[in-house]
Amino acid sequence: MKPYLRSVLFIILVSFQAHGQRAKDGNYTVTSANSVLNSYTTLSSNATIGQSLISVSSNALNGGFFTTNLAAGDLILIIQMQGTSMNVDTYAASEYINSNGQFWGPYTTPFGHQNDWPLFIPLWGEITAYNQTGKFELAQVRSVSGTATINLTCPLTNNYAISGRVQIVRVPRFANLTINSNASTVPSLWNGTSGGVLAIEVDGNLILNANGKISSSGYGFRGGVTENQTLGAPSGSVNDVGFCASHVATQGAEKGESIAGFYTEYDLVYSRYCKGAPANGGGGGNNHNAGGGGGSNVGSTTLTYTGKGIPSITYNTNWNLELAGMGGSNSPGGGRGGYSGSTSDQNENTLGPNQMAWAGDYRRKEGGLGGHPIQQDNTRIFVGGGGGAGDQNNSQGGGGGRGGGITFLKLYGSISGSGTIEANGANGINANPNGQIAVQASTQKYGNDGAGGAGGGGSVYISNTNPIPNTITLSANGGNGGNQQLSVGLLATSPTNEADGPGGGGGGGYISISSGTPIQQVNGGNSGTTNSTQVINFPPNGATAGSAGITNTNTNFFDILAANDTLCAAGSVTLNASTIGNPPAGNLIWYTSAFGTTVVATGNSYTTPVLNTTTTYYIGICPGSFRRPVTVFVGGNPSITGTPTIVGATCTSSGTITNLTISGGTQPYSYSWSNNGGNSLNLVAPAGTYILSVQDALGCSSTSIPYIIPGITGPSLNVSSALINPQICNGTMGSISGIVSTGTNLSYSWTNTANNSINPSGLSAGSYVLTVTDGNGCTASSPSFVVPYVAGPM
């Protein structure tokens, strides 16, 4: 047997791999911005560990890059987006509703704090159980059935609940992928059931050119939507504390979407509005005109969460007027939204919030809280939480920004270039969302509402075989909070200048890779600001930045290595395979087909039966998303036949051997002649003995009998008996004699004389060289003969 070494065999191997396996979608270049490559569907029935089929809404999945329906060998990503449980006690709201407003109130509380909830607002919405949220796995398709079933080559490793919005993402399997400069690929927008996830597998090289992007920035969970309802200002006492959550829109703005759900789920627990943060979603700004909180993603769960984000240290004096020690504090998660509205110009450097002198809504601490930090878990990945909306009553408020999505890459080759892979949160929407500018001589007034909180950073998850270089940038930053952009005409009615709440910054996201030194950014987003001249010395006006996310190198990767083999006659061979990286527990499994269930062996080696024809086996491991093809090529030795035509070599030209015939084996052939004869079938060489070796594409070979290229001998000169007579002063001329030559049709030529005799006479003193030429034009030359001169007496 012969090892599979030749480059042509590599081409054959790739063709086997590409059939229903990695690289099946070929090479691809992204040339335009915002190209969508994935296609999406949703799980339609709960799925459990060990299942090898899933039920989906549609198994066509022929959108995005794909023009054909899902088929065997395709790759899917299964991920549960939501389904988290959070700390919400609905007792007060349900009693309020059931009693027609006679008891309790239109609000919900943290568990255990029905009566003292104002002291424990940060507990509202904290994550109590993740359930299956964020669980994910790659799976290879074995087949599809009907229009709604996908059969898998490996059983599921996770449970999935459809109540948690499980989506199925079809993943392109590229051989090589190039992202051109200024081009980008993005997912579909998360729409509440699918989207927000960009997933790609590349078997070979990923080239990410300058300004090229693989991005899910702003494609994640949705921000809270503004509604033009509020209680007005002031709605009560200066020290009133707004609700954590309520089902009544006049109490506050809508919360951002989170891993616990969105308005459908929030409505079920009477908690769609107000400042409490639902899991990693930002809280909505409370009335009147407070800013929305920023969404979040993974973050520190050892630091105490207050929902207040990170106050800018530039304004520690102002923060400490709100609460001693607040300046320099750090709450993980998203940033808080800014204070509620004020209409009186006071000194913000000496007068804190919740003071009657501010008028309006007293500039109360009613901004939406930043999203709760998610506990890092290597078995889960999350979308960034949406920002909470700003409270509005003038249709000038800003909605919350979308969270960053998930950028998921499986890379078996190298990555190069200087582009960006990102999943940043989107900025919160400004108060005055359309950027209108009031005409000076008018009553126009724009921007007089609360701004939206930013989206939290999403997740960049890369399983890479080779290290990611430091020329690549990975980014999962939180977005920046929305700004209050006031623009008021000179004839506007009072209040002509008011300060409302900017949005909180989004918390940083999550980056996980296998290895490398890329630039990694998981920064929290900045708070928004206000341009109101009432708080010119404190533009954040109560809004804070989001905290940083987390990066690590915990992403697992593995690959299966195996070499093909060759038999030049029917026989058996032992094939070997190994793994690199961090494969799942369990043995390698040898199959007879790429997607079938027939197992022929387990373990790292397999001895085949006697094979008469070329046969391919497939090695996989479960859980896993591919099988590696291993081919045993069965061939025969090539034959060398024919009577060669041999032309002898001469002193002026090489000889040749031609007209041999090669047959059998597997083309193309390679040739090698002995004695450095060259690597072509037809030989051109000096006289000598030569043997031809022929190797076919499978490495099988044959050698010929020896072939002789004869040589044609040229003339020769024997000068050993040469006699030189001198020229003498008495007139006797010199001569050269005794030279013997061999050859046919010889002619002679001497230097320095016209004499053409082999033994010339009549020579003057001097130096002479003889050249003899035969009938074939071959020559031989003598050494130089010197005829002396003998002078007379002096």
Regions found by a protein language model. Give the residues of each.
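Bacterial Sec-dependent N-terminal signal peptides
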Residues: 1-23, 622, 637
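Proline- and Ser/Thr-rich low-complexity, intrinsically disordered segments
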Residues: 20-21, 538-794
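Autoprocessing Asn-cyclization modules and mimics
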Residues: 21-134, 145, 149-151, 181-196, ...
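Repetitive beta-strand solenoid architecture
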Residues: 50, 66, 72, 135, ...
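Short, solvent-exposed secondary-structure boundary/capping segments
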Residues: 54-55, 143-156, 223-228, 432-435
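Extended Gly/Ser/Thr-rich low-complexity repeat segments
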Residues: 64-82, 158-178, 210-213
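Acidic glycine-/aspartate-rich tracts in secreted/extracellular proteins
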Residues: 81-84, 145-147, 155-158, 220-221, ...
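Glycine-centric low-complexity/flexibility signal
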Residues: 87-120, 159-161, 176-178, 185-461, ...
